[in-house]
Amino acid sequence: MTKLLEINHIQTLCFAKGFSPARLNVATSPFRISRRGGGGYCSNACIPYRLKFTCYATLSAVVKEQASDFSGKEAALLVDELRSNFNSGRTKSYEWRISQLQNIARMIDEKEKCITEALYQDLSKPELEAFLAEISNTKSSCMLAIKELKNWMAPETVKTSVTTFPSSAQIVSEPLGVVLVISAWNFPFLLSVEPVIGAIAAGNAVVLKPSEIAPAASSLLAKLFSEYLDNTTIRVIEGGVPETTALLDQKWDKIFFTGGARVARIIMAAAARNLTPVVLELGGKCPALVDSDVNLQVAARRIIAGKWACNSGQACIGVDYVITTKDFASKLIDALKTELETFFGQNALESKDLSRIVNSFHFKRLESMLKENGVANKIVHGGRITEDKLKISPTILLDVPEASSMMQEEIFGPLLPIITVQKIEDGFQVIRSKPKPLAAYLFTNNKELEKQFVQDVSAGGITINDTVLHVTVKDLPFGGVGESGIGAYHGKFSYETFSHKKGVLYRSFSGDADLRYPPYTPKKKMVLKALLSSNIFAAILAFFGFSKDS
């Protein structure tokens, strides 16, 4: 079958093999990428696509993806197969769960180099960033699940009430069934495998749909999952919109989606048809409020780490904008400039430690933000672009118009607007004027301001005096609130999001009181009222026909 790939997919795919995606003629789609006198084959196992390339500025082409047909019928058969295997009880045992988790850990250890290469092909992600942000985080989550799985699976004993005496009660976790994980392109390994770890630990059958915009990672995940995991209950489906649509038309026991709000609405609408519960890991405009009493160098370094050293700003928890006072702004900007040069050199566009923009579409989106009326003249640092390499230098802007798209939309790139206020407390109103973000950051030594920030700022998560690190704490839930998402995961929260907590009450055949059965009499009512009010003395009096007032 010839699959028509999205333009973004093709552009990303071309760049992964060293061909400039910036000159693609997007006016014609589908299109053929051709060259006089021959073609080329992407032999890398991570990207199984046959392409023909060109030397010309204007290109047109069809890309043939070497993949099997995947229609609604195939999707239905897949879900039926996985549900049958789930219903057999195969995934519910501790032995199956632990073996699959151990296989994931082994996969990460044995294929770390392949994973790193795929992340570089898709995003030019530096090796150390790939290890810290994706590989080590995923391995850590897997090892925690292996260590704690027996404890997580154990029933939780809870208290019973006097009305059920004698009895005992437990909360028993059970797997939901067959679940769908749809992941994002910006951290394509972490955001694919981490929720799958939770789904497996909870005993589910799972289908992973990786993002087609990160084709090298998508192809690698399909290859590795088929090699390391139980394919009768764990599958990867590659593809774009048609494949995702076919999957969403099926009945799932849960859908876990990481991505943007626009697609999330489509996911929710599809899930509503079958009353399927969803987890939506989205994003938003994550603010960093910077007080004037901070260690300026440390604050600047940590803001950079949570912006440009975090996939070049293409992160849902990355710093989207900074708020500080008018008097302090120039000092903060100078500190950021100094540390940016230390991190990325005088020409950041040539730095190997700065990821590229994922594809031409997102590059153009960011470029248009910079060129918007009233924005370009607000640049105080950076603003350099290189379209052929899909790179934008770390860019700082001061007091861009509130009505600009840069302040109304999630930036998701290396542009950092700084908004100034008279008093640092005025920053709270700026944050509250926007939808609730996935993360919010505060830099201060003022404990009262810190307390107020935690109490008054509604966000998925908060880090004080740093950025993004809260997501590495596995005992903290990671998820959004409001428009930044629904539900949470990481650590035990991943296990719980893919589990149903079933309440179970155990009773014997003894202690069968007549009080609960007809005929209902005034005496029974007196005794039951006393019992339900936990007044044992009154219950005894009522049992013998006396009221507590007699």
From Swiss-Prot:
Q: Which reaction does it catalyse?
A: an aldehyde + NAD(+) + H2O = a carboxylate + NADH + 2 H(+)
Where do the catalytic residues lie?
E281 (proton acceptor), C316 (nucleophile)
Which Pfam families does the record associate with it?
Aldedh
Q: What is one GO cellular-component annotation here? A: plastid
Describe activity versus pH: Optimum pH is 9.0.
Q: Where is the protein found, in the record's own terms? A: Plastid, Chloroplast
Q: Which InterPro entries match?
A: Ald_DH/histidinol_DH (IPR016161), Ald_DH_C (IPR016163), Ald_DH_CS_CYS (IPR016160), Ald_DH_N (IPR016162), Aldehyde_DH_dom (IPR015590), Aldehyde_DH_NAD(P) (IPR012394)
Q: Name one GO molecular function term.
A: aldehyde dehydrogenase (NADP+) activity
Define the transit peptide region by residue numbers: 1-59
Q: Name one GO biological process term.
A: response to water deprivation
The protein's UniProt keywords, in alphabetical order, are: Chloroplast, Disulfide bond, NAD, Oxidoreductase, Plastid, Stress response, Transit peptide
Q: Which segments of the protein form a coiled coil according to its record?
A: none
Q: Where does NAD(+) bind?
A: G259, G260, A261, R262, V263, A264
Give the site residues for Transition state stabilizer: N186
Activation/inhibition comment: Thiol-based regulation. Inactivation after dimerization under oxidizing conditions.
Q: What is its EC number?
A: 1.2.1.3
Instruction: Explain the induction of this protein.
Output: By abscisic acid (ABA), dehydration, salt stress in plantlets. Induced by heavy metals and H(2)O(2).
User: What is the recorded function of this protein according to its Swiss-Prot or TrEMBL entry?
Assistant: Involved in oxidative stress tolerance by detoxifying reactive aldehydes derived from lipid peroxidation. Medium- to long-chain saturated aldehydes are preferred substrates, while the short-chain aldehyde propanal is a weak substrate. Can use both NAD(+) and NADP(+), but the coenzyme preference is substrate dependent.
What PANTHER family would the database entry show? ALDEHYDE DEHYDROGENASE, ALDEHYDE DEHYDROGENASE FAMILY 3 MEMBER I1, CHLOROPLASTIC
Q: What else is known?
A: Plants overexpressing ALDH3I1 show improved tolerance when exposed to dehydration, salt stress, heavy metals and H(2)O(2).
Family listed: Belongs to the aldehyde dehydrogenase family.
User: Mind telling me what this protein is named?
Assistant: Aldehyde dehydrogenase family 3 member I1, chloroplastic
